[in-house]
């Protein structure tokens, strides 16, 4: 791609070789408002090793925020603070000339999820087997895990990530941890590793602007992958804390919902969550987000109410069950997936209907107890069905 370098104007290829520092830049692109951009490296955030990308290169190769770029940098002069990109060799692991002609994410056609992401794997946890039948996840699902504190939502999210990684290695996993405890970040980073896994985080001691910036980079990264017809899954913990961060950073609109929430603060988290979709042209973006309830904060309940009707899959965790040390603490009657007929086969649909009828009228604890007994007495879901 040397002859297409936009940074060196009309100079010949041999002049480019003189300018080449021999250092390869690799990272995610962030395009600034003024038209130029930077290749970021660690955790999608600004750092001293960032590489400058000129506006002409961005226009020529149709580059957008979230693209992963690879290319050589120019020899840095003493006056320059950042290295500059000399020429591009790859965009999202593809040839730049091919990557230029991709479709825009917004121009693709969203459809209902119709291909299931199987969560059951080997001697898997009961939680994954229950999810597989009672609230299945498809490629392109917009799912929500509704949970009170200490009900095991982070553990559940981790199990989902490990199951998806094992059963669906083609899916690119992006795990976004917002306002999370540092030790949990380390735990997730060490337990979920692989070529298709990225753990991006902003711990609770960071500024709200930091949370906002990280989340925007993650959603842009996911959109760029979907434009290349890849299957992507984002696991976010939690959408409530993301909404809180936006509430502190948006300019006040003059209106306030109960709990002190500015209605303008919900726009970006809704755009984030609403990006999940299955594409008719190929590719999908699945988002599984946790939402906090019963925290004692009115704001958290308002955020949950605002997001309630937007998802097409809901998994509800129950505090009473977790207090009784019944794990997984899933409130089965309240958990479901819309249009699950597209994801389950006939036998599974019949089994789910029988189970739901049997659970109707039971208290949550009794329902979970009877379901747990059913699952623990069988080796896998196939044994349960037949």
Per-segment meaning from a language model:
Residues 75-145:
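P-loop NTP-binding catalytic core
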Residues 139, 151-152:
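ATP-binding Walker
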Residues 152, 160-164, 168-169, 173-195, ...:
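P-loop NTPase catalytic core
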């Amino acid at each position: 791609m040397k002859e297409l370098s936009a940074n060196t104007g009309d100079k010949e290829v041999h002049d480019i070789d003189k300018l080449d520092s021999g250092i390869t830049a690799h990272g995610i692109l962030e395009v600034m408002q003024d038209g130029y951009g930077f290749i970021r490296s660690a955790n999608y955030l600004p750092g001293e090793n960032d590489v400058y990308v000129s506006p002409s290169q961005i226009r020529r190769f149709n580059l957008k925020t979230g693209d992963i770029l690879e290319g050589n940098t120019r020899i840095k002069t003493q006056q320059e603070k950042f290295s500059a990109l000399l020429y591009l060799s790859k965009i999202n692991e593809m040839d730049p000339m091919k990557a230029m002609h991709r479709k825009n994410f917004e121009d693709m056609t969203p459809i209902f999820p119709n291909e299931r992401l199987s969560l059951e794997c080997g001697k898997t946890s009961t939680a994954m087997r229950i999810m597989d039948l009672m609230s299945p996840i498809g490629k392109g699902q917009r799912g929500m895990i509704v949970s009170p504190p200490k009900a095991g939502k982070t553990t559940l999210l981790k199990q989902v990530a490990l199951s998806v990684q094992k059963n669906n290695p083609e899916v690119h996993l992006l795990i976004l941890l917002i306002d999370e405890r540092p030790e949990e970040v380390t735990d997730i980073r060490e337990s979920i590793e692989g070529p298709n896994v990225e753990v991006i985080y902003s711990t609770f001691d960071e500024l709200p602007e930091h949370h906002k910036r990280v989340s925007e980079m993650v959603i842009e990264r996911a959109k760029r992958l979907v434009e290349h017809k890849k299957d992507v899954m984002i696991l976010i913990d939690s959408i409530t804390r993301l909404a809180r961060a936006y509430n502190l950073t948006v300019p006040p609109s003059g209106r306030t919902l109960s709990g002190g929430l500015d209605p303008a603060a919900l726009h970006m988290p809704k755009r984030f969550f609403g990006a999940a979709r299955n594409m008719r042209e190929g590719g999908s973006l699945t988002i599984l987000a946790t939402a906090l309830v019963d925290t004692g904060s009115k704001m958290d309940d308002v955020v949950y109410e605002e997001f309630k009707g937007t998802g097409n899959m809901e998994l509800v965790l129950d505090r009473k069950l977790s207090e009784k040390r019944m794990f997984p603490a899933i409130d089965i009657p309240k958990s479901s997936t819309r249009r699950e007929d597209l994801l389950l086969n006939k036998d599974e649909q019949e089994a789910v209907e029988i189970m739901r009828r049997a659970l109707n009228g039971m208290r949550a604890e009794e329902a979970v107890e009877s379901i747990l007994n059913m699952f623990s007495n069988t080796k896998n879901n196939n044994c349960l069905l037949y």
